Amino acid sequence: MSNVFTHINADGNAHMVDVTEKAVTEREARAEAFIEMASTTLEMIMSGSHHKGDVFATARIAGIQAAKKTSDLIPLCHPLMLTKVEVELEAQPEHNRVRITSLCKLSGKTGVEMEALTAASVAALTIYDMCKAVQKDMVISQVRLLEKRGGKSGHFKAE
């Protein structure tokens, strides 16, 4: 792990990292998020009886769109040409929650961790938005990077 913030220059100011001289490599990142809710809310989602339609399909599309728009949301992120974005949603009724996982890939000069994290986060936010009329105290939690591959820092896998 590095002990240097790459987005802070010598004067202490935020700046976008120059990746001009970096090698193009295959890069991949996986992230996850959870949204906890009442069992009745989760049952509405799982049964398809939610009045706004297919919550999982909408959240999946929102996550994919969010990954593509990450550089518009996170100020110092580079715009990336993503080659793959996957968002999966898994109802976990034994825990009254939904687990959201995302995968982002590209061949490029900078990593896709922020895109994967943004995809999982926005998918969770979309579930919240679609279900808030039924339940307002849902909790989004444990947004984290699960794994990344490629680039100078190599492979990372969360424990």
From Swiss-Prot:
<feature type="active site">
    <location>
        <position position="129"/>
    </location>
</feature>
<protein>
    <recommendedName>
        <fullName>Cyclic pyranopterin monophosphate synthase</fullName>
        <ecNumber>4.6.1.17</ecNumber>
    </recommendedName>
</protein>
<dbReference type="Pfam" id="PF01967">
    <property type="entry name" value="MoaC"/>
</dbReference>
<dbReference type="InterPro" id="IPR023045">
    <property type="entry name" value="MoaC"/>
</dbReference>
<keyword id="KW-0456">Lyase</keyword>
<dbReference type="InterPro" id="IPR050105">
    <property type="entry name" value="MoCo_biosynth_MoaA/MoaC"/>
</dbReference>
<dbReference type="GO" id="GO:0061799">
    <property type="term" value="F:cyclic pyranopterin monophosphate synthase activity"/>
</dbReference>
<dbReference type="InterPro" id="IPR036522">
    <property type="entry name" value="MoaC_sf"/>
</dbReference>
<comment type="function">
    <text>Catalyzes the conversion of (8S)-3',8-cyclo-7,8-dihydroguanosine 5'-triphosphate to cyclic pyranopterin monophosphate (cPMP).</text>
</comment>
<comment type="subunit">
    <text>Homohexamer; trimer of dimers.</text>
</comment>
<comment type="similarity">
    <text>Belongs to the MoaC family.</text>
</comment>
<keyword id="KW-0501">Molybdenum cofactor biosynthesis</keyword>
<dbReference type="InterPro" id="IPR047594">
    <property type="entry name" value="MoaC_bact/euk"/>
</dbReference>
<comment type="pathway">
    <text>Cofactor biosynthesis; molybdopterin biosynthesis.</text>
</comment>
<dbReference type="InterPro" id="IPR002820">
    <property type="entry name" value="Mopterin_CF_biosynth-C_dom"/>
</dbReference>
<feature type="binding site">
    <location>
        <begin position="114"/>
        <end position="115"/>
    </location>
    <ligand>
        <name>substrate</name>
    </ligand>
</feature>
<dbReference type="GO" id="GO:0006777">
    <property type="term" value="P:Mo-molybdopterin cofactor biosynthetic process"/>
</dbReference>
<feature type="binding site">
    <location>
        <begin position="76"/>
        <end position="78"/>
    </location>
    <ligand>
        <name>substrate</name>
    </ligand>
</feature>
<dbReference type="GO" id="GO:0061798">
    <property type="term" value="F:GTP 3',8'-cyclase activity"/>
</dbReference>
